[in-house]
Amino acid sequence: MNEENSLLTGAVRPALLRYALPIILSMVATQFYAVADTMIIGLRLDADALAAVSNASTVLMIFLFVSGGMELGGGLLVAAGKPTATKHEMTELLYNLLFVDEIIALLTTAVGFVTLPALLRLINTPAEILDTAVLYGRIYLMGLPFLMPYDLSKECVMGCGDSKTPLKVIVATSVMNIVLDLVLVGPFGVAGAAAATAAAQVAGAVYMVAFLRRTQMDAAFSPRMLKTRYARDIFRLSAPNSVQQASGTIITTVS
């Protein structure tokens, strides 16, 4: 049976388990990477470096929730449209999602670059680690234009009923990130850790967007495919979630 249609036919429980288990394992793999990343930085560098990464990561969460909102909105649109949309309609939807996502990613990166030092001061980052935290954060933000389409593509593929491919890619990029951490953190410090993460995001984005293009689209991109009605739907579903998550993080961080 075609995996992307298996949730719509046959017994519900086995199909749901086959779909949900890879998602759970994806979350486990992501958490394992986060722990491994912290351990490598803690073992290879000093306490100040680890504190700088921790402070930068707290601020970066504000920008990452923008990505999370786009993921949720994109996944909902794809899952809602998949059962009835034609291949060409799905192609248009996916291109519009990726286009809007990339524009938002570039804008978010620019805002992050400018506001990062002020946001770090706002959370009382110690002066002695401020420059290191800014360095880590800005290198990490350079990967955001790849992280956002990577995350969105994973969510769109899952919205089409395939949760195994995103799991495989998450495991592969996590392993790549850890290996690059081991290679780069020692000689380059927190900059190496951020560069390792950005490189893994680039690799994940390239693979997932190519996979989405190969399996779910029937035409090359054309500017004529961009339509305002898709943009309205994207913002309608994505913006409230992004604002809700980001505002909660801002309030918790500042307080």
Residue ranges and their predicted role:
Residues 41-61, 127-132, 191, 195, ...:
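Interfacial/gating helices of multi-pass transporter permease domains
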Residues 35, 39, 66, 106-117, ...:
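Membrane-embedded alpha-helical segments of multi-pass transporters/permeases
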Residues 174-206:
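Membrane-interface helix-loop junctions in multi-pass transport and translocation proteins
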Residues 18-37, 139, 173, 200-204, ...:
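Transmembrane helical elements of multi-pass membrane transporters/channels
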Residues 50-110, 147-166:
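Small-residue-rich hydrophobic transmembrane alpha-helices
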Residues 32-51, 120-127, 183-188, 246-255:
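Helix-terminus/linker motif at the lipid-water interface of multi-pass membrane proteins
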Residues 1-20, 197, 209-249:
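Interhelical loop/hinge segments that connect adjacent transmembrane helices in multipass membrane
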Residues 127-150:
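Alpha-helical transmembrane segments of multi-pass membrane proteins
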